[in-house]
Amino acid sequence: NLKQLTLYAFSQENWKRPKREINLLMKLLKEFLIKERKEIEENNIRLTAIGRIDGLPEDIQRELAISIEESKYNTGMVLCLALNYGGRSEIVDAAKEEITEETFKNFLYTSEMPDPDLLIRTGGEMRVSNFLLWEISYTEIWVTPICWPEFRKEHLEEAIKDYAHRERRFGGLRE
């Protein structure tokens, strides 16, 4: 069972895309937030978000806040949407505080989340695209040629099955 799933839904770099595409992505996000509230509640999922949320359109911020508030007491899987997110921005925002290596994670957007065990990279791209740069230092990566809009439950199951057969060493040697 997954305890935490973070979806890189919209990067800061995505603002460079054509306005028409951005508008479509925001429309899809808003529809998702409204349409999936019931399913999120029925499945006891807690919704969270990371990124520079205040840079999103006001209607998206409002719908996101409603979805987060309505699910905040759910105790099942945590579904985190990375929105207007950039790994470098996260590090810069965290570094604005007086920090040590021990306290650095406390200032990240993801401070209350565990580091990811598995990163699923869609679209066949062999790069991390400015995503969770601090947090994925020992994350296993699974790359699929399937693009995000076509990614389905069976693809997720395939990734998890592959991950289950890996030996995680966190920088150590094989046993």
Regions from the language model: what does each represent?
Residues 1-175:
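Flexible, compositionally biased loop and terminal segments
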